[in-house]
């Protein structure tokens, strides 16, 4: 509850934020023009219709149309220089659900006072108990002074988090990055690093990496370079004396050999696009809508109390074939191809990616539409590059 009190007076706001020169804004003007054309066409169609009384049967359709109009307007906001931000202070009353989240005036902020944060008896939000001050975790042994005023709470917490004496922050980050490269962390419970989780297999290595990470200015890139150039990462997947390795390391927690890992779902899709020559390596920009299984794309889903529009991929291959990291994430609408290869769900924190070898993966690679499209792309690339049939066979 002390940590919760730090964020108790933090509110959301949509503030003006002009695009930076290095941001990817390609296609913005074309999308704005497309939205204007659709809006104008819809308005002309509505203006041409005769006035009619709304019958009870039409009421539901009108309600659905209004909600789809709200969704359309929200999608157009993606091309406006607006940033989803936060501020400290009183909340601002919204006149409509679709209205923009604006910060209150400075005068309104100066007249308000922070609300009291209390321990909720039994976890019930309507049973406020003993009041609690903003504070940090005492178990770390590192104290911090968090102000009770509106301003300064999150800044003080951030300074406590990145303090060199904080025993958690650097170790948690290092353990996560190590797990990304080796398939398992030095401590196998990344979400529960500490006394209640599994102890690290190599605690001295974890401590040294954490100190080195802080010493290098918290540089993630430098940490990646340090791990990838280490002898542990560059080891072979086989050992000249496997019996000795099995005897000395029966649980497989050591690093005498590098245990290969399967490509993650996103890496697999990107690799298939790269081999076929269809991958668009452009960085940044808006989320894209890749191709998806037709049956999954047409699957009904609910949003805002009514049915959502069907999933429609982006019209251009250059948009659809971006890297998977730029794909739009919809919690209720997941790509079956990526899910088959253990892509974690977006509705919960993923402690560790599970790896499975199941029959649907074989069918997805042999018979799936994704594989078929990539095979056609590879064939087109080979035929375009090769001068003869023998060259085409060699390239393939």
Predicted regions and their residues:
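Primarily short, surface-exposed interaction patches in extracytoplasmic proteins
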Residues: 23-321, 338, 344, 348-359, ...
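A broadly conserved detector of short glycine/acidic/proline-rich loop/turn motifs that flank catalytic sites
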Residues: 7, 279, 329-331, 369
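Short Ser/Thr-interspersed hydrophobic loop/turn segments at strand-loop and sheet-helix junctions
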Residues: 330, 334, 342-343
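C-terminal, active-site-flanking charged/polar segments
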Residues: 1-19
